[in-house]
């Protein structure tokens, strides 16, 4: 089973006011078939942690590794999905999805075949030739997800991928993410500001403190696995235990913020 690990990582930035610690001694891991969700106030280091896992920046101290091999930069084993889909408007849907494969030297027929496969997975079959300005925000985010999946990474790293969507589209996308996770068995690291979303999607939930970001709580949750075994989202969300956990986490986050 593939495993992406951060071990005792800290990130310190220089500023005019002196050293600023964004993350302090954070250890966590994401394995195949897991959804690890990071939740915390703005500025607590969630995106910095994702940046370390993606290889976009090195930690000031500590270590990031995949299966014991140090991460030295971005890699095809880690697909990244951002809140801003960052699609290329001069390319159509299938060319956006296949772009990374094109950069890897994969031939046109092979990369388009793979792109069609992942477009079917994210329920966008039939939209291959559409321009980016012809599709909705939710569809654009699905194109971004398909692009991340095209290289068949072991891990998906997702930085508030649903944050800019309206409430109904967001609910549909939550279900789609669970469907993709169930179908692929990939390890997922996801950042969100939505407590409800975190409770639904996480197999492990990490609570980060306000700056400097530290993991102050870890919660093992089973709602995503219940969905994977066939229970509808509506049934899961109507479970009193779901509501109880949701409210307890809101209270915990409020306490963390008030203590700053």
UniProtKB/Swiss-Prot annotation:
* GO terms of molecular function: ABC-type taurine transporter transporter activity; ATP binding; ATP hydrolysis activity
Q: Which residues bind ATP?
A: 40-47
- Membrane-related topology note: Peripheral membrane protein
Q: Does the keyword Glycoprotein apply?
A: no
Its recorded name reads Taurine import ATP-binding protein TauB
Q: Where in the cell is it found?
A: Cell inner membrane
Subunit-level organization: The complex is composed of two ATP-binding proteins (TauB), two transmembrane proteins (TauC) and a solute-binding protein (TauA).
Q: Does the keyword Cell inner membrane apply?
A: yes
Output the Gene Ontology cellular-component terms. Answer: plasma membrane
């Amino acid at each position: 089973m593939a495993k992406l690990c951060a071990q005792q990582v800290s990130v310190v930035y220089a500023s005019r006011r002196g050293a600023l610690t964004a993350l302090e001694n954070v250890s966590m891991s994401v394995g195949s078939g897991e959804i690890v969700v990071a939740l915390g106030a703005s500025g607590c280091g969630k995106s910095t942690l994702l940046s370390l896992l993606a290889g976009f920046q090195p930690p000031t101290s500590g270590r990031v590794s995949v299966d014991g091999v140090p991460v030295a930069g971005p890699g095809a084993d880690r697909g990244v999905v951002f809140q801003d889909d960052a699609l290329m408007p001069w390319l159509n849907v299938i060319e956006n999805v296949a772009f990374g494969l094109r950069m890897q030297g994969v031939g046109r027929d092979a990369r388009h075949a793979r792109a069609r496969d992942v477009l079917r997975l994210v329920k966008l079959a039939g939209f291959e030739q559409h321009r980016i300005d012809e599709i909705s925000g939710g569809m654009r985010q699905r194109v971004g997800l398909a692009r991340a999946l095209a290289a068949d990474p072991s891990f998906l790293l997702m930085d508030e991928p649903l944050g800019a969507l309206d409430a109904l589209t967001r609910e549909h996308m939550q279900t789609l993410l669970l469907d993709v996770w169930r179908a692929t068995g990939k390890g997922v690291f996801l950042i969100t500001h939505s407590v409800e979303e975190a409770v639904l999607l996480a197999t492990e939930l990490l609570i980060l403190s306000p700056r400097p970001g530290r993991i102050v709580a870890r919660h093992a949750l089973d709602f995503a696995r219940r969905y994977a075994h066939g229970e509808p989202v509506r049934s899961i969300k109507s479970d009193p235990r779901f509501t109880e956990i949701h409210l307890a986490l809101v209270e915990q986050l409020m306490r963390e913020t008030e203590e700053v």
